[in-house]
From Swiss-Prot:
GO terms for molecular function: structural constituent of ribosome; tRNA binding. The keyword Ribonucleoprotein applies. Gene3D superfamilies: Ribosomal protein S10 domain. Keywords: Ribonucleoprotein, Ribosomal protein. Belongs to the universal ribosomal protein uS10 family. SUPFAM superfamilies: Ribosomal protein S10 (SSF54999). This is Small ribosomal subunit protein uS10. It comes from Rickettsia typhi (strain ATCC VR-144 / Wilmington). Involved in the binding of tRNA to the ribosomes.
């Protein structure tokens, strides 16, 4: 069977995430490997509600949220040139990258 490399990208800023995705896709396409994606995964939104005043006025509150954006890239049947190209890609500081190697047996 074929091996696969799954690349999962996470970021709070969707613009930097899209830029990192474009850089990875272009690096992989230069090695003539087949790539599936970018597949947008569901974003996760965390909301926090806090009181505006520490003493009274319980009804006066403020709400904050954190949005986590995610993308998935799958490289089918990678060769050593793909791994070398991925190691040379320079990404933005706010993008978290998780790379998984999957053996298709």
């Amino acid at each position: 069977m074929k091996n696969k490399i799954k690349i999962r990208l996470k970021s709070f800023d969707h613009r930097s995430l899209d830029q990192a995705t474009k850089e990875i896709v272009s690096a992989v396409k230069r090695t003539f490997a087949t790539i599936n994606g970018p597949i947008p995964l569901p974003r996760k939104i965390e909301r926090f509600t806090v009181n505006r005043s520490p003493h009274v006025h319980k009804k006066s509150r403020e709400q904050f949220e954190i949005r986590k954006h995610k993308r998935l890239l799958v490289i089918d049947d990678p060769n050593p040139a793909v791994v070398d190209a991925l190691s040379k890609v320079d990404l933005a500081a706010g993008v978290d990258v998780v790379i998984e190697l999957e053996n298709g047996e």
